[in-house]
């Protein structure tokens, strides 16, 4: 008889809830384990089968660690601010609060039906004022530390969404959400000085147990490069152009300068006869994304400003051009073009017939850019030097002339933080009529997001909050001075930068969390989530954590010690699941048809946790069949314990049981759940082959199965005669001596040829091995009529007989 998953799963979910089985105590003396999931954005679509993969992995580890005696923190919450809820509200006229709350209820129900062992008393929601009070508090600390500032920057303006997007939210010139066109436009924005932490964000990656590929993505995003800052004087002007270059040694090969179309000097230095052409070009460039502009396959375009600069070492006059392949967001937004030794510059020079000067020998620079090593030529004092020596010498020369210095540059830009939307945390700043700016007093936090029916973006660059006079206008009670509240809101990233801290002490009204509790629980021991958050969320959270570390709020330099990215679950045809393809699988349907335990087991058995694997109904059915086999081994059709489960040990399962405990333990430690499940299947197959199964072995098996399939685990534990939940039962141990057989098979050779294979007790002496070998019938036949000259015995391996 198969088990009734609907009945069993509901029964144990109710039991866990009523008994608060997974409530985490703050026993600060106990060894701890903090297992964290990337909390979800509660969308209208609800959970899909991709969500439970990561959640099941952390849940297995959490249950496993509890059984190993750890104090486990395993929480869940909601990343509920952000564009999607607001977009839905705009499209349907529904309030984002109601929509978000309804979605959270659906998500929570679905998650609870999958049997995850979360401590729901620690649930957080980024849109809860008691939560975002502390998001605002962190912003104030950033502001006080000089890390939050207002700047006029060329931003990614998306008219359709009515807001500014960060570089990371723009893909191929369109918004990541919705695919709307994005344009570059100068606007006043709040910016966070993440660049101040660039070196630490880079260096501390080495201390983390993260996939190397993710570390590399962060390293590339930060993009540290060493070189020089070079100052070029503009002819007939007191202005200078500053350039960052990693190759100051090629300065004698500079034949022109290129500025980005947005460079602040462009309008100032352009001559009147070039004005119209330059303005037209700037306008065209503003419609292109950074990716389009830097596409190497794209034909180079540009316009001459009519003005020249002076090469500080050679004294040559250099025409100043603008071109969209130079970005204002990288380096200084200006490039010293060395067409002889840079492919993009060569392409540009060839198109506009600009000089190409060879300064490193070894190529044919009139035909193509030579980017290899070589001796310097046509380079004054640098002649004859190789690259590295020439770089040092060039910096020395520039410094002596006051025209440059050694410099480290980062690709990383400061974090564009403000959003012109309604559904986000209000920024706690007041702008006063005398031009000054102050933060909202900390004792007045949270600064509440006002309720309103009018949440449409203003389209002018201001958020909908600008339309709410009662929110915007303030008067200083002491001075009578009038002020306006900041109307921009924070991005969705803000709440997710620090949520892992709030789980540690979620109801604390006086501080983010108690310092002693932070000291106990940090860092997070295991963080599992999708690879799509490799750069943004993880980099932003690391940045905030380091600021809080500097402020003495948190005791660790890094938030997440071990990171693991689960793979993607694809549709049956190896295609990405999507509504448009109609191949999305709803976990509710699987829970109803096969049970939550089957879904959990199947998603862990599909393949390695980090691989992209196609969904298979056959695989799902196979996982259910295995659980039915487990059930039938222990429970009879009459609903009683199988008589073959006995209290005495006939030792037939000693080896496979101990092997199973060892393998499952090791595999859980490395998140190799698919191979752990394979071993559990091996054990069950062996149990079916024997007449008797030793009860402690079955109990050990149920303990090992329960983190993966907790409902059937609890039910079988209960049926085996135990009153308490299996949750805190000690994890099984194995006996090393039982991992090997008492007997071994040895080979018997006569004159080098195998004549017999025999099983012998493994502790037999050499003499006993020889006697056994010589008494074997096959061996006797082989040596009949011959004289045995020598017998060599190798314990547990072979006996070699030489006979003539």
UniProtKB/Swiss-Prot annotation:
Keywords: Aminoacyl-tRNA synthetase, ATP-binding, Cytoplasm, Ligase, Nucleotide-binding, Protein biosynthesis. One of its GO terms (cellular component) is cytosol. One of its GO terms (molecular function) is leucine-tRNA ligase activity. InterPro entries: aa-tRNA-synth_I_CS (IPR001412), aa-tRNA-synth_Ia (IPR002300), Leu-tRNA-ligase (IPR002302), Leu_tRNA-synth_edit (IPR025709), M/V/L/I-tRNA-synth_anticd-bd (IPR013155), Methionyl/Leucyl_tRNA_Synth (IPR015413), Rossmann-like_a/b/a_fold (IPR014729), tRNAsynth_Ia_anticodon-bd (IPR009080). A motif ('KMSKS' region) lies at residues 576-580. The keyword Ligase applies. It catalyses: tRNA(Leu) + L-leucine + ATP = L-leucyl-tRNA(Leu) + AMP + diphosphate. A motif ('HIGH' region) lies at residues 40-51. Its EC number is 6.1.1.4. It is found in: Cytoplasm. One of its GO terms (biological process) is leucyl-tRNA aminoacylation. ATP binds at residue 579. The keyword Transit peptide does not apply. Belongs to the class-I aminoacyl-tRNA synthetase family. This is Leucine--tRNA ligase.
């Amino acid at each position: 008889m198969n088990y009734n998953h609907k009945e069993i799963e509901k029964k144990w979910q109710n039991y866990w809830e009523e008994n608060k089985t997974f409530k985490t105590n703050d026993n600060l003396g106990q060894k701890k384990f903090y297992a964290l999931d990337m909390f979800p954005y509660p969308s209208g679509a609800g959970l899909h089968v991709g969500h439970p993969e990561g959640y099941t992995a952390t849940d297995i580890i959490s249950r496993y660690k509890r059984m190993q005696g750890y104090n486990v923190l395993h929480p869940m919450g909601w990343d509920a601010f952000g564009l999607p809820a607001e977009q839905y509200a705009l499209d349907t006229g529904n309030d984002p609060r109601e929509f978000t709350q309804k979605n959270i209820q659906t998500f929570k129900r679905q998650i609870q039906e999958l049997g995850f062992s979360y401590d729901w008393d620690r649930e957080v929601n980024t849109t809860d004022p008691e939560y975002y009070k502390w998001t605002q508090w962190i912003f104030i600390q950033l502001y006080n530390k000089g890390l939050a500032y207002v700047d006029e920057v060329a931003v990614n303006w998306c008219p359709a969404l009515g807001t500014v997007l960060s570089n990371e939210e723009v893909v191929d010139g369109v918004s990541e959400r919705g695919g709307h066109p994005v344009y570059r436009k100068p606007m006043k924005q709040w910016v966070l000085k993440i660049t101040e932490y660039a070196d630490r964000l880079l260096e501390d990656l080495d201390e983390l147990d993260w996939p190397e590929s993710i570390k590399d993505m962060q390293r590339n995003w930060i993009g540290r490069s060493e070189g020089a800052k070079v100052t070029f004087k503009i002819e007939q002007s007191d202005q200078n152009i500053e350039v960052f270059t990693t190759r100051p040694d090629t300065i004698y090969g500079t034949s022109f300068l290129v500025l980005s179309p947005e460079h602040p000097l462009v309008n100032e230095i352009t001559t009147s006869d070039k004005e119209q052409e330059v303005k037209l070009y700037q306008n065209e460039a503003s419609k292109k994304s950074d990716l389009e502009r830097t596409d190497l396959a794209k034909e180079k375009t540009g316009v001459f400003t009519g003005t020249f600069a002076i090469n500080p070492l050679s004294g040559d006059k250099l025409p100043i051009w603008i071109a969209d392949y130079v970005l204002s967001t990288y380096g200084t937004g200006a490039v010293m073009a060395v067409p002889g030794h840079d492919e993009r510059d060569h392409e540009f020079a060839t198109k506009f017939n600009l000089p190409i000067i060879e300064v490193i020998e070894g190529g044919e620079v009139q035909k193509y850019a030579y980017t290899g090593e070589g001796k310097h030529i046509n380079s004054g004092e640098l002649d004859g030097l190789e690259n590295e020596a020439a770089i040092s010498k060039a910096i020395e020369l520039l410094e002596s002339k006051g025209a440059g210095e050694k410099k480290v540059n980062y690709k990383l830009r400061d974090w564009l933080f403000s959003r012109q939307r309604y559904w986000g945390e209000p920024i706690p700043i007041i702008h006063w009529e005398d031009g000054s700016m102050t933060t909202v007093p900390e004792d007045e936090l949270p600064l509440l997001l006002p309720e309103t029916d009018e949440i449409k973006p203003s389209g002018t660059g201001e958020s909908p909050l600008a339309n709410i006079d009662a929110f915007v206008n303030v008067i200083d009670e002491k001075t009578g001075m009038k002020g306006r509240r900041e109307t921009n809101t924070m991005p969705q990233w803000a709440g997710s930068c620090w949520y892992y801290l709030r789980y540690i002490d979620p109801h604390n009204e006086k501080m983010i969390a108690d310092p002693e509790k932070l000291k106990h629980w940090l860092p997070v021991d295991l963080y599992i989530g999708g690879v799509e958050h490799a750069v943004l969320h993880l980099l932003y959270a690391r940045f905030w954590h380091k600021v809080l570390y500097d402020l003495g709020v948190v005791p660790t330099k890094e938030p997440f010690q071990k990171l693991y990215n689960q793979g993607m679950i694809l549709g049956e045809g190896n295609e990405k699941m999507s509504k448009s393809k109609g191949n999305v699988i709803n976990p509710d349907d699987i829970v109803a048809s096969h049970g939550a335990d089957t879904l959990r087991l199947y998603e862990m058995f599909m393949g390695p946790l980090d691989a992209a694997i196609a969904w298979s109904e056959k695989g799902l059915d196979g996982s259910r069949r295995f659980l039915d086999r487990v059930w039938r081994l222990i429970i009879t059709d009459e609903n009683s314990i199988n008589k073959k489960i006995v209290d005495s040990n006939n030792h037939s399962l000693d080896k496979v049981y101990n092997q199973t405990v060892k393998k499952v333990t090791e595999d859980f430690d490395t998140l190799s759940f698919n191979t752990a499940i394979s071993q559990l299947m091996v054990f069950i197959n062996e149990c079916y082959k024997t007449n008797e199964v030793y009860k402690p072995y079955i109990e050990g098996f149920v303990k090992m199965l329960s983190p993966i399939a907790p409902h059937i685990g609890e039910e079988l534990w209960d049926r085996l005669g135990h009153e308490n939940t299996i949750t805190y039962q000690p994890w099984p141990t194995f006996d090393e001596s039982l991992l090997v057989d008492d007997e071994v098979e040895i080979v018997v050779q006569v004159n080098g040829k195998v004549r017999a294979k025999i099983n012998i007790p493994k502790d037999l002496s050499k003499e006993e091995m020889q006697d056994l070998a010589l008494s074997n019938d096959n061996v006797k036949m082989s040596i009949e009529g011959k004289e045995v000259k020598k017998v060599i015995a190798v314990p547990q391996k072979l006996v070699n007989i030489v006979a003539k």
